[in-house]
């Protein structure tokens, strides 16, 4: 075969959060549609794309290392993603990068690829691109990104400077994508964005259309429509606006999963004010109590930052007291670290590293105890579990309380007659700090 007829091959490295993963899926889908072949090794690739993360310093370092590796192993590299918004920082370390674009610059990335590795004239791969596009997740679950950007200006965050203000996708487009994914075999949709509860705010919640029917562009309307698809629907990155209360009844009725991922960040009003986050802890506790009264099965996940500038021992104790009272099911904790360009860098009273470390361990120790107690309460119950994989020891799945990658798992030892994506009923027999063990019962 002559050189001109060879199928051009692209290598791809995707880093960062699920939102970045969705961006990678979109670029890969376009490449496959245009006839490019995506290959798993640097040696086989004519060009390598690195989709970067730039949210915190460790992510920046990982991205720079990935770019360096791609340059060393291949030599022709295009960079995109969040770190791409800081072109000078990349060029300083890796001047040989061919092109750099920011996040969700799909057309720009493709244009650069076309320049360095022209599109094939004959396209034998179009028929092989599935209707739902190229997915980087297992077949039975997928991320559904409903918007880009964020209108908040949290002092620890630089996302708006990289991804811009809130830009909601048309609701008809989102629901069409959801329907395609379900038709392709997806059993669980994970709704993601920078701020899921703000969906539609930028469009003044304009009315869109789906299946010939008018639908309001809002999180609640979206949930009502997704509920009709007959699959698991899980909400992530939900800012605690008042209208979040409206989705709890949908969870209680079994229409969407009883699971809320709400990044609360802290419990001290002073620290929350320094972060530019909403700060009524009493109101948050009242709402948590009310949500659980409406939907007793509700799982609450949150993330917090310890060691934020100005955080005193008293502030930190308020956070521990909040954890004790709220008894959240799933919690992530980060030690504050300066992010280039974040307003928090300018705040006085930076907390020493050894104090951050000590507070982090105290926080995790308390939450581990709470998590253990919450999971012990599940022993003896029968829970729906979605199977993720089957290995030599048995099946591994997740309950409604477990999102992939970030939460716990349900282990079904010696259970081999199931397959990924199957939802089974499991009697829970054992629990530790984060995971459950059980046996499948008759369906």
Curated annotation (Swiss-Prot):
Broad EC category? transferase
Gene that produces this protein: rimO
**Sorted alphabetically, which keywords does the UniProt record give?**
4Fe-4S, Cytoplasm, Iron, Iron-sulfur, Metal-binding, S-adenosyl-L-methionine, Transferase
GO MF annotation list = 4 iron, 4 sulfur cluster binding; aspartic acid methylthiotransferase activity; metal ion binding; protein methylthiotransferase activity
From what superkingdom does this record's organism come? Bacteria
Q: Name one Pfam family in it.
A: TRAM_2
Its protein name is Ribosomal protein uS12 methylthiotransferase RimO
Q: Does this UniProt record's set of keywords contain Iron-sulfur?
A: yes
Q: Name one GO cellular component term.
A: cytosol
Q: Which cofactor does it need?
A: [4Fe-4S] cluster
Where does the TRAM domain lie? 376-442
Residues that coordinate or bind [4Fe-4S] cluster 1: 17, 53, 82
* Signal sequence annotation: none
Which HAMAP family does this entry report, sorted A to Z?
MTTase_RimO (MF_01865)
Q: Name the family the entry cites.
A: Belongs to the methylthiotransferase family. RimO subfamily.
The entry's function note states:
Catalyzes the methylthiolation of an aspartic acid residue of ribosomal protein uS12.
Which example biological process does GO assign this protein? tRNA modification
* Binding positions ([4Fe-4S] cluster 2): 150, 154, 157
Q: Which residues form the MTTase N-terminal domain?
A: 8-118
Catalytic activity annotation: L-aspartate(89)-[ribosomal protein uS12]-hydrogen + (sulfur carrier)-SH + AH2 + 2 S-adenosyl-L-methionine = 3-methylsulfanyl-L-aspartate(89)-[ribosomal protein uS12]-hydrogen + (sulfur carrier)-H + 5'-deoxyadenosine + L-methionine + A + S-adenosyl-L-homocysteine + 2 H(+)
Subcellular location field: Cytoplasm
Bound how, and how many: what does the cofactor note say? Binds 2 [4Fe-4S] clusters. One cluster is coordinated with 3 cysteines and an exchangeable S-adenosyl-L-methionine.
Q: Where is the Radical SAM core domain?
A: 136-373
From which organism does this entry originate? Proteus mirabilis (strain HI4320)
Show the InterPro entries listed in the entry.
Elp3/MiaA/NifB-like_rSAM, Methylthiotransferase, Methylthiotransferase_CS, Methylthiotransferase_N, Methylthiotransferase_N_sf, NA-bd_OB-fold, Ribosomal_uS12_MeSTrfase_RimO, rSAM
What Enzyme Commission number does this protein have?
2.8.4.4
